[in-house]
């Protein structure tokens, strides 16, 4: 399945929540009618079955992190293999993706933009160039912008937005050096309460 490149607002409306696919520190709710389904007249939401709820939650999380179905299923299998809560393990694996860490550090205004920076070899991990968006970052890894890429206007704009919004607690960033440290894998309490990972576990456990 190809990666979706259509209107980001449409995806957020379908899931009924802001998926943070667009740049900016403000929610898109003021621009996008989150409570209406896509379409000219925004059809009302029908009663959803248990399976439908599980499927929608999986699609929501998959779209937030920009992961295709095949890769998402592999993440679930790895999460299930590891000790602890499968749902929490899944979210931690997604949060440890290099493109997501670049986004969390404020070097990109969206995860899609972060994915481009990684793919275009603008990102280094511990001083070595890495161009794989799904690369799993470990606690203590130093993420930096390659020197030749530091003059990109989109990086400067992203850092400015990040300065307004603030960084998450599990990364430490020195914007003057264009680098940051992934201090630790976030706990479940650090992540969005708007995600019901247990619904995803129920879906894949069938």
From Swiss-Prot:
Q: Any idea which UniProt keywords this protein has?
A: Ribonucleoprotein, Ribosomal protein, RNA-binding, rRNA-binding
- Supply the InterPro entries for this chain: Ribosomal_uS4, Ribosomal_uS4_bac-type, Ribosomal_uS4_CS, Ribosomal_uS4_N, S4_RNA-bd, S4_RNA-bd_sf
Q: What Pfam families does the entry give?
A: Ribosomal_S4 (PF00163), S4 (PF01479)
GO cellular-component terms in the record?
A: small ribosomal subunit
Give the Gene Ontology MF terms in alphabetical order.
rRNA binding; structural constituent of ribosome
Disulfide bond annotation, renumbered to this chain: none
At the top level, the lineage of the source is Bacteria
Signal sequence extent: none
The processes (GO biological process) annotated in the record are: ribosomal small subunit biogenesis; translation
Q: Does the keyword Chaperone apply?
A: no
Domain (S4 RNA-binding): give its ranges: 96-156
**By its UniProt entry, which PROSITE patterns does this protein fall under?**
RIBOSOMAL_S4 (PS00632), S4 (PS50889)
On whether Calcium is a keyword of this UniProt record, the answer is: no
What the protein does comes down to:
One of the primary rRNA binding proteins, it binds directly to 16S rRNA where it nucleates assembly of the body of the 30S subunit.
Assembly mode? Part of the 30S ribosomal subunit. Contacts protein S5. The interaction surface between S4 and S5 is involved in control of translational fidelity.
Q: State the family named in the UniProt similarity comment for this chain.
A: Belongs to the universal ribosomal protein uS4 family.
Descriptive protein name: Small ribosomal subunit protein uS4
């Amino acid at each position: 399945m190809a990666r979706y490149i259509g209107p980001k607002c449409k995806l957020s409306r379908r899931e009924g929540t802001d998926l943070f696919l667009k740049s900016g520190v403000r929610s898109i709710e003021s621009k996008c009618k989150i409570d209406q389904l896509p379409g000219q007249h925004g059809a009302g939401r029908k009663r959803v079955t248990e399976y439908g709820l599980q499927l929608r939650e999986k699609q929501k999380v998959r779209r937030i992190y920009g992961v295709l179905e095949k890769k998402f299923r592999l993440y679930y299998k790895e999460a299930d293999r590891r000790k602890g809560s499968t749902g929490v393990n899944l979210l931690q694996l997604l949060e440890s993706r290099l493109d997501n860490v670049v986004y969390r550090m404020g070097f990109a205004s969206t995860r899609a933009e972060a994915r481009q920076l990684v793919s275009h070899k603008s990102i280094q991990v511990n001083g070595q160039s890495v161009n794989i968006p799904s690369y799993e970052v470990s606690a203590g890894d130093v993420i930096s912008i390659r020197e030749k890429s530091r003059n990109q206007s989109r990086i400067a704009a992203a850092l400015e937005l990040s300065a307004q919004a603030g960084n998450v607690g599990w990364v430490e960033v020195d914007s003057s050096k264009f680098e940051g440290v992934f201090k630790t894998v976030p706990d479940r309490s650090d992540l969005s309460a708007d995600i019901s990972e247990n619904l995803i576990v129920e879906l894949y456990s069938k």
